[in-house]
A protein has these predicted regions:
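Glycine-centered coil/turn sites that cap beta-strands in beta-rich domains
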Residues: 381-424, 433-437, 445-451
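Conserved glycine-rich acetyl-CoA-binding loop
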Residues: 454
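Extracytoplasmic/lumenal domain signature
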Residues: 1-380
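Short linear sequence motifs
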Residues: 4, 72, 117-120, 355-358, ...
């Protein structure tokens, strides 16, 4: 919801050179479409990159143009490069100053660079970084080794996974060399719950690599054919251990637990054809279990229960092929989810007529609106942050991040009420309740040291 009307909008790019915005009723938003003059293949990232309190839309196009739009469709700024921007940009606070930087990759003939810029078009210090290999997918960004500094992970057509430090240097232990090119971006997740992120990426030889933060290989899964679209993360069977969901040219949708080394019972499931999309997860029917949504390239949309059995009314045949990842939201605020799917023929929105659940899950491409490709708690930071006095209920970003040795959260109440502040991990499990009390109206600051309930 970028225009503040309490209803979600749908934003997407197309091969006709336009970037579109529609409301929940299918009406084109004022200021849209926005023409960039070339194919728009990257999923837009959304975040407040200029610190004005409103979210901006960031996307790339095949003419080397990175566009930053205001929420009314007007141009905020443009950054031009030589080459193509096909992958989704990622938004992340690289320097800990409270502002989101924009990280994106390029494809220039057989070469490519990794860019990091500020919202005003200025290059982040020591960027761009010339990788010397083209990249057709975007970067993943997070703090891999819990050292308080961001890491940028990119996968290339040169059969490599690179990790770039925030100072522009290549992280020790990288690049990791595989045996074929990568057409999927990396996903970052703490699989073994040791406080450090693993890197997950699949190549065109069917190999799904799971790497530790230092570049050593932790696990390997072989599908026998190209892995495409992307890798999502979920705890489908609620055993406290994460599964990796992915598909590709083997026509199967996999749900693999790398810690146990096996696929879940009932998986993989047959999609009937190649898949180019990243699976997404959501509790569609409010039963407490997650459903998995995926599509094949011939336009068949599938929904499966957590155990691999088909969801009612699916599979569903759509007009046109599907080459992009669906997204799920309650667009019309009626208490059930809608599934939005872009096809080669247009945009399709499917209304799922069941009460929706509220489980934390991977509901869109790259896991979040910032397109960081990461599952975990991310607190925006600003050491000099001063909370405003809003006219409505307000929760501030946590600061500082990483907490040193703690982080603070400001909550503003417009009237006296009960405050309950709870911390959850990426699996949706309660970590700690740091406050549960009645409070007067006004500003309240709560501190968390990173401890759990124990």
């Amino acid at each position: 919801d970028l225009n503040g009307d309490l209803f979600s909008e749908i934003y997407f790019g197309a091969d006709d050179g336009n970037f579109y915005g529609f409301d929940a009723e299918g009406t084109s938003l004022n200021g849209f479409p926005f023409n960039v003059g070339a194919d728009v293949r990257s999923s837009p990232a959304v975040g407040d990159v200029d610190g004005d309190g409103d979210n901006e839309i960031v996307f790339g196009s095949s003419n080397g143009r990175l566009s930053i739009l205001n929420n009314d469709g007007s141009e905020n700024s443009i950054y031009q490069i030589s080459g193509l921007i096909n992958g989704s940009p990622a938004l992340y606070d690289l320097d800990g100053d409270g502002d989101l930087e924009i990280v994106f990759t390029s494809d220039y003939n057989s070469s490519g660079k990794v860019y990091a810029i500020h919202h005003n078009g200025e290059d982040f210090e020591n960027f761009p970084v010339d990788i010397g290999e083209k990249m057709l997918v975007g970067a993943a960004v997070n703090d891999l080794d819990a050292d308080g500094l961001a890491d940028i992970v990119v996968c290339t057509w040169g059969e490599k996974i690179h990790v770039i430090n925030v100072d522009g240097s290549i992280k020790q232990g990288f690049p990791f060399i595989s045996n074929k090119r990568f057409n999927t971006p990396a996903t970052l997740v703490d699989l073994d719950l040791d406080g450090k992120m693993e890197i997950v990426a699949g190549n065109d030889n069917g190999l799904l690599h799971v790497l530790k933060y230092d570049g050593t290989e932790m696990f390997l899964f072989d599908t026998g054919d190209d892995i495409r679209g992307g890798i999502s993360v979920s705890d489908l069977n609620d055993d406290g251990s994460l599964e990796l969901l992915f598909s590709g040219y083997d026509d199967l949708l996999h749900a693999w637990n790398p810690i146990d080394g096996v696929e879940l019972a009932g998986w993989p499931v047959d999609l009937g054809d190649n898949s180019l999309t990243e699976p997404i997860t959501v509790d569609l029917d409010n039963d407490g279990d997650l459903e998995v949504i995926a599509a094949n390239k011939n336009g068949i949309l599938y929904v499966f229960h957590h155990d691999g059995t088909p969801f009612s009314a699916f599979p569903m045949s759509l007009a046109g092929g599907v080459e992009s990842t669906p997204v799920v939201s309650d667009l019309d605020r009626d208490g059930d989810y809608e599934i939005a799917v872009g096809t080669t023929m247009g945009l399709v929105v499917i209304d799922v007529k069941k009460d929706m659940g509220d489980r934390i899950s991977w509901k869109l491409h790259r896991g979040n609106m910032e397109r960081t490709g990461s599952m975990g708690i991310v607190l925006l930071s600003n050491d000099n942050y001063e909370p405003p006095t809003p006219k409505e209920f307000y929760v501030s970003p946590g600061y500082p991040n990483p907490f040193n040795p703690s982080t603070s959260i400001n909550i503003y109440l417009i009237e006296s009420n009960n405050i309950k502040v709870s911390i959850y991990d990426a699996l949706g499990r309660l970590v700690n309740t740091i406050k549960n009390k009645n409070a007067m109206s006004g500003n309240h600051t709560f501190n968390w040291t990173g401890s759990d309930n124990n």
